[in-house]
């Protein structure tokens, strides 16, 4: 039976007053109280995992208990930081904060590797009055905050120790469309993280936009391993609260160690009639294709029920999608299952995805024209052909336009500009950063083109600047790259993903997806570059021209291969393909290149570590993506 969405009328999302996810969960507790809400697959003690379940009635009771306790000890407007391991208690903590009417801040257990500096920075920024954690993690959390002054030290509450009986004192919080529900901290790798203020209107709006794009139906089941502190992981797991059916999750580490766990959970279960949906960044598809295919001695899989897996959070590789489909087509996976998508924290999460009945769209455009900010389609075998993956169509009741930032004017299809967004899923600003909020969230589109993509949006509406380059081509949205990551050498634009792809395709010695391309002023290059005759550059203290640097992690089993042939292959491929000289090729060991908390290559952090020498010496501190047990 098709999912009837009473909140979408004539292409517009309309909610009753004071709507929030709390009311949705309470509805399911009343009408489906004895049905499964969430299942956590715990692989920390058993290789095959232990199922830890919670019913809708139990979930409601635990949420009300934690919400009531927070109402007793905190004030409206207080920030509630969630420093839990990824399990059922994390979800109860997040919803408990929503039930209390306070502002949730989804973070992570301080025991997670690679995140300590980020966690301190976020706590400094949001100044929570209370931290929610578990009994097992409470001691570690208290040690983590011990360095803070007594006045700044938040209260620590173990949610699993809150008696369910406390739920009887809970009061339904008052919330309007401008009330902040939670702060979603961005995954930036060089600046102090910014907390996007997501309201009680933004959150259900974006959840509905995702469900509408996935054509959610009665009986559909969600599956995820993504971290809850990341926007894609959080919104994906919250889909169940609106759809009202079960959702299964595991930790990121459980997936990374054995990606077949994710694949097996996506497969049809006995007696199931609905489909499954999920979301993952691009690397996960390659990882699953390489290591997640069932062994001959394992039970058979039926993946014909997989409706859609949103592929987002990092650039989408056509090769990775092909490998994934080829690996799992024998098990019934449909070619339409993988959905290249676009989203960002400032939009709560979701902006666009590939329509359900379409396979991923891959076109080829001319590289020279692309670097001139134009999309010109060419044959796949053309000399300058560059593959571009469509991010699909924009969600219901949301608008995306391509803008010339100098004039704030909409650009016609085929021209590349900054992507601006409008809709009720867009956050209202960055926590405590008024100037930055105004620059990002409060922009006016000064002119529109005929057949504008802003059609239906108010003339005086506020638009959010994404910081991403993109264009429309043949009705689809394409993402060209981050504005701040653009490599400009000798006046020519180069997209870093394009350079990185050429580098990794030129040699088998690099890990796929672990290459960073960026530019550095010539006078900031290390002396080693000027001593290398292959670099073709002499030191001049006044030379500030930007020079290209490629950093790549060595693939497994290649650490003994000689450096020079690898560097020569990379230099030659980029010189031929892009007409630019690589001044330095730095090969580092696996795990060295900085990553953002969402798993993306941290190009700006990599550039900083390169300039200060810590990357070459091997003492940089990359963010570790795989967290949890």
UniProtKB/Swiss-Prot annotation:
EC number: 6.2.1.20
CDD domains: FAAL
Pathway(s) it belongs to: Lipid metabolism; mycolic acid biosynthesis
GO molecular function, one term: long-chain fatty acid [acyl-carrier-protein] ligase activity
Keywords: ATP-binding, Fatty acid metabolism, Ligase, Lipid metabolism, Nucleotide-binding
Binding site for ATP: 186-191, 341, 345, 468, 482
Known partners and oligomeric status: Monomer.
Family: Belongs to the ATP-dependent AMP-binding enzyme family.
NCBIfam families: FAAL_FadD32 (NF038339)
Function as written in the Swiss-Prot or TrEMBL entry: Involved in the biosynthesis of mycolic acids. Catalyzes the activation of long-chain fatty acids as acyl-adenylates (acyl-AMP), which are then transferred to the phosphopantetheine arm of the polyketide synthase Pks13 for further chain extension. Can use dodecanoate (C12) and tetradecanoate (C14).
Protein name: Long-chain-fatty-acid--AMP ligase FadD32
Organism: Mycobacterium marinum (strain ATCC BAA-535 / M)
Lineage, uppermost ranks: Bacteria, Bacillati, Actinomycetota, Actinomycetes, Mycobacteriales
Gene that this sequence comes from: fadD32
